[in-house]
């Protein structure tokens, strides 16, 4: 078995560190085409855990799963030129099958609003029952100019939910509700604190009336748009001529939403929590919560028996585990466990067997605990809970300490140069946003709500025009 290679430090080269971690920790291999990856078992298990948790919420909300075609016909694209404009450079187009040119192009979905609109039209015409709440777990393809594993792939996995409602208020409120769930999920399961808010006109999803987003800070202080929910209004319903009959039997145009999160969350987990030794998983999302390392078990069968006893206790406690019973050296086993990020490792040798004792090590801070095996279930649960809380606390401190308020363009430029998240009074045009991006590299991440955990003043003077505004916008360099 090959010894784990040294991982580049975060301070030396953050981008190289990230790639080192995800490859050496066996999350993925590069695929044969730019922007594609092979999900290895550990990497895919993270996604399976995400799916399980998120799907349970969807079931409670009576959101049903479906699966729609990968291919979109040309006439759908023609109906929604404005919506597809934003995806035009990334749109994969099929023009030929075998040696025959197609009469009309076929497109590979970059997202599925067009398909859901078509489906909703048929279902409402048949049943006239609203709302309809659907979700699909699928893959989409976008020919990205710049790719980065998990964060920006040509092909990636995601969930995209779509609903259709009789009421404008109901639809918009539902989009906001999903955005709140995304915030809850990231903070409570992934231990990633986020800033939530509404996208600006320039940054909102093409075809949406409003886009609600959750933004996270990575360890290099770049923002990552982690999930979004869109209130689509009647934009798609009008173009697809979707109608329902109201209580007075009059034809009305309904309102839609769409919302999604993707495998970029795997990249977020790595970039927020991991260190120069490898992965660090929050326990609630960890594929393996406990690594059991056997030392000298080939010469001492009692070590192996003790490991199985530990495994049985963990299994009964519904704590996931893996036993390393290889004949590798102690240093290798510890290093390998560190790289792969299990929140806890338990080290077992002849001394632990002799004393009926557990040696438990936290992955995040390397703190060691020694206790009798009878306390394993209680101690393990408590320590896993503490790790989850500590990872969130550490990430939130980073977010708060590196988010600043500014009142002028000079302060803004200085803060961005120093890799800060910047909150500024801002009520300018999309052209001003573009100017800021070209000059500083920062983009508007979201308009902060009044109930943000940041103590926002009632009003401020917009940093360009000086006009009084009650709008405060978060800016940052981003992925």
From Swiss-Prot:
It is an enzyme of class 6 (ligase). One of its GO terms (cellular component) is aminoacyl-tRNA synthetase multienzyme complex. Transmembrane segments: none annotated. CDD domains: ProRS_core_arch_euk (cd00778). InterPro entries: aa-tRNA-synt_IIb, aa-tRNA-synth_II, aa-tRNA-synth_II/BPL/LPL, Anticodon-bd, Anticodon-bd_dom_sf, Pro-tRNA-ligase_IIa, Pro-tRNA-ligase_IIa_arc-type, Pro-tRNA_ligase_II_C. It is found in: Cytoplasm. Keywords: Aminoacyl-tRNA synthetase, ATP-binding, Cytoplasm, Ligase, Nucleotide-binding, Protein biosynthesis. Its main location: cytoplasm. It catalyses: tRNA(Pro) + L-proline + ATP = L-prolyl-tRNA(Pro) + AMP + diphosphate. It holds the Pfam family tRNA-synt_2b. Its EC number is 6.1.1.15. GO terms for biological process: prolyl-tRNA aminoacylation. SUPFAM superfamilies: C-terminal domain of ProRS, Class II aaRS ABD-related, Class II aaRS and biotin synthetases. GO terms for molecular function: ATP binding; proline-tRNA ligase activity. Catalyzes the attachment of proline to tRNA(Pro) in a two-step reaction: proline is first activated by ATP to form Pro-AMP and then transferred to the acceptor end of tRNA(Pro). Homodimer. Belongs to the class-II aminoacyl-tRNA synthetase family. ProS type 3 subfamily. Consists of three domains: the N-terminal catalytic domain, the anticodon-binding domain and the C-terminal extension. This is Proline--tRNA ligase. The lineage of its organism: Bacteria, Bacillati, Mycoplasmatota, Mycoplasmoidales, Metamycoplasmataceae. The gene is proS.
């Amino acid at each position: 078995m090959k010894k784990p290679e040294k991982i580049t430090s975060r301070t030396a080269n953050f981008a190289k560190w990230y790639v080192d971690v995800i490859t050496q920790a066996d999350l993925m291999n590069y695929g044969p085409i730019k922007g594609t990856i092979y999900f290895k078992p550990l990497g895919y298990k993270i996604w399976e855990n995400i799916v399980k948790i998120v799907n349970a919420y969807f079931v409670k909300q009576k959101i049903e799963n479906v699966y729609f075609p990968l291919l979109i016909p040309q006439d759908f694209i023609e109906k929604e030129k404005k919506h597809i404009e934003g995806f035009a450079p990334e749109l994969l187009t099929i023009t030929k099958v075998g040696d025959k040119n197609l009469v009309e192009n076929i497109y590979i979905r970059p997202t599925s609003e067009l398909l859901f609109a078509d489906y909703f039209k048929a279902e409402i015409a048949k049943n006239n029952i609203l709302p309809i709440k659907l979700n699909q777990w699928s893959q989409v393809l976008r020919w990205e100019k710049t790719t980065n594993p998990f964060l920006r792939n040509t092909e990636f996995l995601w969930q995209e939910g779509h609903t259709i409602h009789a009421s404008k208020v109901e639809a918009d409120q539902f989009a906001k509700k999903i955005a709140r769930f995304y915030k809850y999920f990231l903070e409570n399961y992934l231990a990633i604190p986020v800033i939530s808010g509404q996208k600006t006109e320039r940054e909102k999803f093409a075809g949406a009336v409003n886009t609600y987003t959750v933004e996270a800070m990575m360890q290099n202080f770049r923002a990552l748009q982690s999930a979004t929910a869109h209130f689509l209004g009647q934009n798609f319903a009008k173009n697809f001529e979707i109608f329902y009959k109201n209580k007075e039997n009059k034809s009305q145009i309904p309102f839609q939403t769409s919302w999604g999160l993707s495998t970029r969350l795997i990249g977020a987990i790595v970039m927020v929590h991991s260190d120069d030794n490898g992965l660090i998983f929050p326990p609630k999302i960890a594929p393996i919560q406990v690594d059991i390392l056997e030392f000298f078990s080939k010469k001492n069968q009692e070590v192996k028996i003790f490991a199985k006893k530990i495994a049985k206790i963990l299994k009964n406690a519904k704590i996931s585990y893996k036993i390393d019973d290889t004949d590798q050296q102690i240093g290798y086993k510890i290093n390998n466990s560190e790289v792969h990020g299990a929140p806890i490792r338990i080290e077992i040798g002849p001394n632990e067997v002799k004393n009926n004792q557990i040696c438990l090590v936290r992955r995040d801070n390397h703190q060691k605990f020694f206790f009798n095996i009878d306390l394993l279930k209680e101690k393990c649960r408590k320590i896993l809970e503490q790790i989850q809380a500590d990872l969130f606390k550490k990430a939130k401190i980073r977010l708060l300490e590196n988010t600043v308020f500014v009142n002028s363009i000079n302060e803004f430029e200085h803060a961005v140069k120093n890799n800060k998240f910047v909150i500024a009074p801002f009520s300018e045009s999309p052209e001003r946003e573009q100017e800021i991006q070209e000059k500083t590299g920062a983009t508007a991440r979201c308009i902060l709500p009044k109930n943000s955990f940041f103590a926002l003043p009632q009003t401020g003077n917009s940093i360009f025009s000086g006009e009084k505004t009650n709008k405060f916008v978060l800016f940052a360099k981003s992925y």
